[in-house]
Design a protein with these regions (language model features):
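Generic detection of long, well-ordered alpha-helical segments
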Residues: 54, 84, 141, 242-246
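Conserved alpha-helical substructure of the radical SAM core
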Residues: 2-105, 112-116
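A generic local structural motif
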Residues: 61-62, 117-121, 235-237
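Accessory C-terminal segments flanking Radical SAM cores
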Residues: 171-261
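Flexible, charged surface loops at secondary-structure boundaries
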Residues: 66-69, 125-127, 243
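Amphipathic, soluble alpha/beta structural segments
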Residues: 6-11, 153-162, 255
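Conserved AdoMet/S-adenosylmethionine-binding subsite of the radical SAM
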Residues: 83-197, 201-205, 211
Length: 261
């Protein structure tokens, strides 16, 4: 079966904030090859790769597909997901489980150079309709556009953002309020399902708090009410009801959210 894209994937944050069907973001590694300020996934703090196994990925994704079959896009993310030694196999698994959805990978694009002459790679991307959501650094937009165009894969390229500036996204601070008003103000994309280590989180701030704790020897608390375990018992209703203020919100301060660094 061929899933070639008939038109270019349109990346729009406004849709993801609340208009699309679900977007699933599955973190397959904590490792990254950049050291970006204010990384929302705290990748610069990671001390180990935390590569998801193919077995766990397939089991978790199958359960997600059972609960949420009608999603918009299934994304691999990290860290830098292309550092996972089996990320192409994971894309293939996701493609066959979510045969009617878009399948994508968020990346900084730095590993694409080694595939410049790899025709099998580009044919796989094209035939499986794999979307590359690329953040552009160091003025490489032209190179990335030309690379995808050269291999007839321009429909598979989505420029996510310009990585030339950074804004504050995470500010851990205990004793904060937990309220519907704060939750609505928070701004994390409400149509996203954040998945890591077999669990669903409402936001990366909670999802990657363990990296902060380990790096700084801190004690942010993630309770059983702050995540859902993805297993055979998970239901669509649980996922939908989960999109509400969580106990972890008491450890997050929004006062400097989105301020430029």
């Amino acid at each position: 079966m061929v899933w070639q894209l008939k038109e270019r994937y349109k990346f729009d944050w406004n849709r993801i904030f609340g208009k699309d069907a679900w977007h699933i973001e599955y973190s397959i590694t904590d490792k990254c090859n950049r050291n970006c300020a204010a990384c929302s996934h705290l990748a610069p703090l990671s001390k180990r790769p935390n590569f998801v196994s193919k077995e766990e990925f397939e089991q978790v994704t199958a359960n997600l597909n059972r609960c949420l079959p009608d999603i918009h896009t299934f994304w691999l993310t990290g860290g830098e997901p292309t550092l996972h030694p089996e990320y192409i196999s994971l894309l293939n698994i996701a493609r066959h489980l979510y045969s009617e959805a878009y399948i994508g990978i968020y990346t900084n694009g730095t590993t694409l150079r080694k595939f410049e002459q790899d025709e099998w790679f580009w044919q796989f991307i094209k035939d499986n309709g794999i979307v590359w959501g690329v953040t552009i650094y160091n003025g490489e937009k032209r190179y990335i556009e030309e690379l995808f165009d050269k291999h007839d894969c321009l429909n598979n390229l989505a420029i996510v953002r310009n990585g030339s500036s950074f804004t504050n996204l995470t500010n851990y601070s205990k004793g904060q309020e937990v309220s519907r008003k704060k939750y609505e103000k928070c701004g994390w994309e409400r149509r996203k399902i954040n998945v890591r280590n077999g669990k669903i989180f409402n936001c990366p701030t909670c999802e990657f708090a363990d990296l902060f704790n380990e790096y700084f020897n801190e004690s942010l608390k993630v309770t059983e009410q702050d995540y859902l375990i993805v297993n055979d018992l998970l239901t669509k209703e649980q996922v939908e009801e989960f999109k509400n203020p969580m106990p972890f919100c008491s450890q997050c301060n929004l006062d400097i959210r989105y301020k430029r660094l």
